[in-house]
């Protein structure tokens, strides 16, 4: 008798689906690598090589109708919703500030911020690692790069959290969003604070991203706001998600934490990439089909939406040995957590730096931590980012002192 494969419930725009999607991901990769979602009327692509194939063929799979499912963002001017050559032209405006060499110049600043964070946390003996650790570092670093005043970092964090999480809470085709007012309020606050900064940078430019955009003669304020929000969300929220998840997962996998303590060089070689593959903070992105064609025997038509399932692709056994296990010694692979091709995450090198420095200092200063309540950490239901709302931890209060 042949094995009967259970067909899971798959709704690619249901936030609840992404709380624990891994059984469904396995089924999709094995049985329906190009899956038609009959509820949401779009395609899901789950295998690693297929995600890369879509990401690297912008002619056939366009970003110009928007990067989020069922939302027409063709009028938005952010680079994430553009195809080449327009996308590359806009990206090139700030790309020099995100090269590996440019990012390395920020390491001392990032370490100073991490030290400041841990100086506050370590004496407490317990904390919510999401609020006290994970959310602070990227909000401060990205806020500084953009040009927000340092005392505005909590606003930066709140804007990114609300926009990323609230906009992914409910299917756009489902009932009216119960959170519309909170999302609108966050956007109004972001606009009210940012527009005066843009006007100030036009009068007196500084060494920050707002100045780079504000002084472009062909850019209006709306375009500057679009790009600012993109960098703020991508830079603050995804790094927060990765750090928070890894604090939790290293508490549950002490053997992996011991490896990092015994071989700290792993954070320089393999561990950070494995963290990012394992967490895959961004759940999906959308592309729009520009011409009729077939993929794995399925007929895709012009205008169809395709959702790239990064978390499924990053656990594809066709690419990774034992992909369902966290292995900080894993040889570097081509994970797609940052996307791939032309739209590869602009801030990837900065995210890697922040994650590496955070865990170098965290493991040095408070090497032993445990979950305060193993049942507490909960994934926030979302169709965009897979993040924990809270990760309570406990740790000894006689830590290694900060670096002098």
Model-identified regions with their sequence ranges:
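Cytochrome P450
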Residues: 1-404
């Amino acid at each position: 008798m042949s094995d009967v494969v259970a067909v899971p419930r798959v709704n690619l725009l249901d936030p609840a689906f992404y709380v624990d999607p891994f059984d469904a991901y396995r089924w999709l990769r094995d049985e329906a690598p190009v899956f038609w979602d009959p509820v949401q009327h779009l395609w899901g692509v789950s295998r690693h090589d297929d995600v890369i194939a879509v990401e690297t063929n912008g002619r056939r799979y366009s970003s110009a109708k928007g990067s989020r499912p069922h939302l027409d963002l063709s009028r938005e001017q952010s680079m994430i919703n553009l195809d080449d050559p327009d996308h590359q032209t806009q990206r090139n405006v700030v790309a020099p500030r995100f090269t590996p060499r440019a990012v390395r110049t920020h390491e001392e600043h990032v370490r100073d911020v991490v030290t400041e964070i841990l100086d506050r946390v370590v004496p407490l003996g317990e904390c919510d690692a999401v609020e006290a650790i994970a959310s602070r570092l990227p909000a401060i670093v990205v806020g500084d790069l953009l040009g927000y005043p340092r005392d505005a970092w909590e606003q930066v964090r709140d804007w990114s959290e609300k926009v990323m999480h609230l906009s992914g809470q409910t299917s756009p085709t489902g009932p009216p969003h119960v959170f519309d007012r909170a999302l609108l309020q966050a956007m109004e606050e972001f606009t009210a604070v940012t527009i005066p900064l843009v006007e100030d940078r036009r009068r007196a430019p500084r060494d920050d991203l707002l100045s780079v955009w504000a002084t472009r003669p062909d850019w209006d304020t709306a375009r500057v706001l679009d790009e600012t929000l993109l960098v703020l969300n991508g830079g603050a929220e995804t790094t927060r998600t990765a750090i928070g998840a890894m604090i939790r997962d290293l508490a549950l996998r002490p053997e992996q934490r011991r490896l990092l303590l015994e071989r700290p060089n792993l954070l320089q070689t393999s561990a950070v990439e494995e963290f990012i593959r394992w967490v895959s903070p961004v759940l999906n992105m959308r592309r729009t089909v520009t011409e009729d064609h077939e993929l794995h025997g399925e007929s895709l038509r012009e205008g169809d939406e395709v959702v790239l399932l990064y978390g499924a692709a990053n656990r594809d056994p066709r690419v990774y040995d034992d992909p369902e296990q966290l292995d900080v010694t894993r040889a570097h692979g081509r994970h797609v957590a940052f996307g791939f091709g032309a739209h590869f995450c602009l801030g990837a090198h900065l995210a890697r730096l922040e994650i590496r420095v955070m865990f170098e200092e965290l493991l040095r200063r408070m090497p032993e931590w445990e979950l305060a309540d193993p049942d507490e950490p909960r994934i926030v239901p979302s169709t965009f980012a897979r993040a924990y709302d809270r990760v309570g931890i406990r740790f000894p209060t006689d830590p290694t002192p900060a670096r002098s």
